[in-house]
Curated annotation (Swiss-Prot):
Residues binding tRNA, per UniProt: 14, 64, 66, 112
Subunit architecture: Monomer.
Gene Ontology biological process terms in this record: protein quality control for misfolded or incompletely synthesized proteins; rescue of stalled ribosome
Places the protein is found: Cytoplasm
Identification of the protein by name: Peptidyl-tRNA hydrolase
Site (Stabilizes the basic form of H active site to accept a proton): 91
EC number: 3.1.1.29
One Pfam family recorded for the sequence: Pept_tRNA_hydro
Similarity comment text for this entry: Belongs to the PTH family.
Gene name, Swiss-Prot/TrEMBL: pth
Active-site residues per Swiss-Prot or TrEMBL entry: 19 (proton acceptor)
Length: 201
């Protein structure tokens, strides 16, 4: 069994924020893969289903970003899951817009959602890091992640979500590098990434 966590803040005013791309991915994942309706539990919302023959629970913490770890800990404890069974999808300012990286463990790059999860369950869970770009100065980061994606960004955001959802079976199967490559190829094919460095076109 796998626990797939999408990070974000609850409420309509945060719905389109860069910080909420984890929620966006899970919403589309549940829709496309025919998961159960969302229900409230583990201090969040969950949907149950399967991807590639593997049982998967999707979790959107409703604790607000800074306390995401409480919901993850509750779910992991209930299902008796270890860190290798947990994958967290989140925005990443240290990556250019439209770039994706998968890694296990490592630093949190100032992400408060990851900080909370690491404090509650440990650090060695898988992260799907979705680049949203850096605003250029530290004092601008808060406003950057809590603002909606610009209209000009929406096409790549939609393409990114579609590619992640389409190739989710590879992620669930632990084939991280293949998953990462498939997502980047999908974005390149639509003209959103430069072929050389993977930055947004």
């Amino acid at each position: 069994m796998r626990l797939l966590v999408g990070l974000g803040n609850p409420g309509a005013k945060y719905q389109g924020n860069r910080h909420n791309i984890g929620f966006m991915v899970l919403d589309e994942m549940a829709r496309r893969h025919g998961f159960s309706p969302w229900r409230r539990r583990f201090q969040g919302e969950t949907a149950d289903g399967s991807i590639g023959g593997e049982r998967v629970t999707l979790l959107k913490p409703l604790t607000y970003m800074n306390d995401s770890g409480r919901a993850v800990q509750d779910a992991a404890s209930f299902f008796k899951l270890g860190l290798p069974d947990i994958t967290v999808v989140h925005d990443e300012i240290e990556l250019p817009a439209a770039k994706l990286r998968v890694k296990v463990g490592g630093g949190i790059a100032g992400h408060n959602g990851l900080r909370s999860i690491s404090a509650h369950v440990g650090n060695d869970y898988r992260r799907v890091r979705i680049g949203v770009g850096h605003p250029g100065a530290k004092e601008l980061v808060h406003g950057h992640v809590l603002n909606d994606f610009a209209k000009s960004e929406r096409p790549w955001v939609e393409a990114m979500i579609e590619a992640i959802v389409e190739h989710a079976g590879l992620l669930v199967d632990g084939r991280d590098s293949t998953f990462q490559n498939k997502v980047h190829l999908a974005l390149q094919a639509k003209g959103f990434l430069d072929n050389n460095d993977g930055s947004a076109a």
